[in-house]
């Protein structure tokens, strides 16, 4: 095998030596391509696995943790929630519409593969500077393309997109982030797993035909960008949501039978990863007859068939003798269904082309025992340069308030979420635009499932460990503010180039933060994804661990809003304000800096707040609640009253006026009627949570907070209309 071919497959000299040892000979091109894909960062997690192994993954309510297509938790009365968040960053930067659309398609398949009907989607989007003349036009093109791709796929599938977050920063100029989350629901006893066992059991290919789109996608997503990346468009998959809708319905029909042993979606690395993962998990072997693969392009080679990432395809291990029944279901839905292989006990993947053996590869070294790297790490030099920076006011409070509320990181994103169908399936209780976590009703048990997606890249830049822990806490707090109990998380870890020791240190610290927070807050990790090499021309993104917290409220009718719908409601701030300005939005807007330091998270205070919110809501003491986040109580209150029908007369009580922009954790704003104040304050005292009365909601159409005063019309214009103008 010549060195240029090996290099083109991103195989290092050390890895090639391992390949020779595993095979006992030189690989052919097909085998090299298969091994390259399975050992890519995207499929093998070779740089990250050693840090992920310490995550807490168990709890009495966890049915399935990491290692399957998606995580599963018990949501009561025999029902389960199946969910996962995943990235499609590199493809979305190259081809925003197709990249984002197929990102949604992939995460939907991960969930319905487990036997669940998908009932909700979320997304976390990060773009570059939309004001800089050099890149704003391209960034706006990316925003519009990505949003269009997400809405197109989700809407066509009939899956409501009910929430998300969108942020902008210069660090994403060369690498945008597109993280998609999906949640499905099924009976706890009806979960299907990705396994291929039982010698002689048939392996069936179902779904759309295979083309050349997406070739090398897993390898492409395991490398950084440079000027040559513009030629990578052919590696972006092309999605067809209508085919996926048929595939989902066919699979859900199949799941009502007892015809199959296991099922796996064909995602990154296509037929390669699905076959190796199914056999690897089961400790079995497999024969694949590649010439039987349904194709839509002529002249496709075994190499292309194994590595194509054409969308809307699944691999099924059926029970012997039930092949025709399985095929009949998929034919009914006008989908291809062909037996292309069988399970063996050899522990090897045997690839045939017109009855000729063209590839023979041991499965375990590519799946369960793929190489794990221990890359060098070192603390970034910039941390010592930024840690002592202190924020001081230079602008007036009113001026800062206005600048912040109309900033693209805070203002309303109706331009984005209005393109998503949030009410299809008629389960949505709380959707995008209503602040905080989103929530859906589970008709089978009357419960509400709340979910929130969170990632503050600036905080992770300032302190990767505490920043990651804060993401776990913040996502959980948003869920708690709906009245639900946070139960588990899914994570999508977006970082720069792992070959840079400073980036690897950031990643290791981020994992420590997640591990610590999940353990202390009792919200285990049940699924996730790692996206590395988010780097262009040597510049990495800020560390960006995206966390989705999922929780359950037993009675969906008790789901809390984040808006004040009545006048004369008492407005309270819960939790302590500690003067946290490191990595804050107010610093970024006033000083154009991301600097400072972060305080350690007080987990006892966080848990106490969650417990108080749950109990107060159970006792029907609260009218509304919202987590305090970016921009401090000033922005939290401004947004709550912007989406409300009433005005506000509020006084913070802070001696230092800048404290209204403090971003301390473990805080929430709640609204309650005056007759419930005494009972609520007694409960807060019982849980050890400080409660500060800020004022009341009023019938007058104005917003007043300390020296800040705006008419309701001015407030609404700043919040609701700014982004539409910025994105045009």
Curated annotation (Swiss-Prot):
E.C. number(s) listed in UniProt: 6.3.5.3
Compartments (UniProt record): Cytoplasm
Q: Which GO terms describe its cellular component?
A: cytoplasm
Catalyzed chemical reaction(s): N(2)-formyl-N(1)-(5-phospho-beta-D-ribosyl)glycinamide + L-glutamine + ATP + H2O = 2-formamido-N(1)-(5-O-phospho-beta-D-ribosyl)acetamidine + L-glutamate + ADP + phosphate + H(+)
Instruction: List residues binding Mg(2+) 2.
Output: 110, 265
Metabolic or biological pathway, per its Swiss-Prot or TrEMBL entry: Purine metabolism; IMP biosynthesis via de novo pathway; 5-amino-1-(5-phospho-D-ribosyl)imidazole from N(2)-formyl-N(1)-(5-phospho-D-ribosyl)glycinamide: step 1/2
Molecular functions (GO terms): ATP binding; magnesium ion binding; phosphoribosylformylglycinamidine synthase activity
Subunit structure comment from the entry? Monomer. Part of the FGAM synthase complex composed of 1 PurL, 1 PurQ and 2 PurS subunits.
The entry sums up its family as follows: Belongs to the FGAMS family.
Record's protein name: Phosphoribosylformylglycinamidine synthase subunit PurL
What organism, scientifically named, is this protein from? Campylobacter jejuni (strain RM1221)
């Amino acid at each position: 095998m010549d060195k240029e071919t090996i290099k083109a497959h991103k195989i290092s000299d050390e890895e090639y030596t391992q390949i020779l040892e595993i095979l006992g000979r030189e690989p052919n091109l097909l085998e090299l391509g298969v091994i390259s894909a399975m050992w890519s960062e995207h499929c093998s997690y070779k740089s990250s696995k050693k840090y992920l192994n310490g995550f807490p993954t168990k709890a009495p309510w966890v049915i399935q943790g990491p290692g399957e297509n998606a995580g599963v938790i018990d949501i009561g009365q025999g029902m389960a929630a199946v969910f996962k968040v995943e990235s499609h960053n590199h493809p979305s930067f190259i081809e925003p519409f197709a990249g984002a659309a197929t990102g949604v398609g992939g995460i939907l398949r991960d969930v319905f593969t487990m036997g669940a009907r998908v009932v909700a989607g979320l997304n976390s989007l990060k773009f570059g500077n939309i004001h800089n003349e050099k890149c704003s036009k391209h960034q706006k093109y990316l925003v519009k393309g990505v949003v269009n791709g997400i809405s197109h796929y989700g809407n066509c599938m009939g899956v409501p997109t009910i929430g998300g977050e969108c942020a902008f920063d210069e660090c994403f100029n060369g690498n945008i982030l597109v993280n998609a989350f999906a949640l499905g629901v099924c009976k706890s006893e009806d979960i299907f797993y990705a396994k291929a066992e039982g010698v002689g059991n048939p392996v069936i290919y179902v779904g759309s035909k295979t083309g050349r789109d997406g070739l090398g996608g897993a390898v492409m997503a395991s490398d950084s960008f440079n000027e040559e990346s513009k030629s990578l468009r052919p590696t972006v998959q092309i999605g067809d949501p209508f085919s996926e809708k048929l595939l989902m319905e066919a699979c859900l029909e199949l799941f009502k039978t007892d015809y199959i042993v296991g099922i796996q979606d064909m995602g990154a690395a296509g037929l390669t990863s699905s076959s190796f993962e199914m056999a690897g998990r089961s400790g079995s072997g497999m024969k694949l007859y590649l010439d039987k693969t349904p194709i839509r392009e002529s002249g496709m080679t075994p190499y292309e068939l194994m590595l194509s990432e054409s969308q809307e395809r699944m691999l099924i291990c059926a029970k012997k003798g039930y092949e025709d029944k399985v095929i009949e279901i998929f034919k009914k839905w006008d989908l291809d269904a062909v037996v292309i292989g069988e399970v063996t006990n050899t522990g090897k993947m045997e690839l045939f082309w017109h009855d000729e053996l063209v590839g023979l590869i041991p499965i375990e070294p590519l799946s369960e025992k793929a190489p794990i790297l221990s890359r060098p790490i070192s603390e970034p030099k910039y941390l010592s340069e930024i840690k002592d920076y202190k924020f001081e006011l230079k602008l007036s409070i009113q001026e800062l308030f206005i600048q912040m509320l109309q900033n693209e990181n805070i203002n309303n994103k109706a331009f984005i979420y209005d393109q998503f169908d949030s009410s299809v399936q008629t389960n949505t209780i709380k959707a995008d635009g209503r602040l905080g976590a989103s929530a859906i009703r589970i008709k089978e048990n009357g419960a509400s499932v709340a979910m929130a997606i969170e990632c503050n890249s600036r905080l992770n830049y300032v302190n990767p460990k505490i920043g990651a822990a804060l993401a776990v806490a913040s996502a959980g707090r948003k869920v708690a503010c709906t009245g639900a109990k946070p139960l588990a998380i899914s994570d999508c870890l977006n970082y720069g180039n792992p070959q840079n020791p400073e980036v690897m240190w950031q990643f290791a610290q981020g994992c420590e933060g997640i591990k610590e927070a999940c353990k202390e807050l009792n919200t285990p990790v049940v699924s996730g994804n790692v996206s590395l090499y988010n780097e262009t021309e040597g510049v990495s993104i800020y560390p960006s661990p995206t966390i989705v917290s999922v929780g359950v409220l037993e009675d969906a009718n008790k789901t809390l809003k984040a808006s004040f719908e009545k006048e004369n409601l008492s407005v309270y701030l819960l939790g302590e304000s500690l003067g946290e300005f490191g990595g804050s939005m107010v610093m970024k807007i006033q000083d154009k800096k991301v600097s400072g330091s972060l305080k350690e998270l007080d987990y006892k205070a966080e848990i106490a707040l969650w417990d108080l919110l749950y109990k107060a809501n159970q006792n029907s003491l609260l009218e509304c609640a919202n987590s305090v986040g970016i921009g401090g109580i000033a922005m939290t209150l401004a947004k709550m009253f912007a989406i409300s029908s009433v005005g506000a007369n509020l006084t913070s009580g802070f001696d230092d006026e800048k404290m209204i922009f403090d971003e301390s954790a473990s805080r929430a704003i709640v609204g309650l009627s005056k007759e419930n104040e005494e009972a609520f304050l007694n409960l807060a005292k019982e849980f050890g949570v400080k409660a500060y009365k800020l004022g009341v909601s009023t019938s007058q159409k104005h917003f007043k907070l300390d020296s800040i005063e705006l008419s309701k019309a001015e407030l609404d214009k700043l919040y609701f209309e700014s982004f539409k103008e910025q994105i045009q």
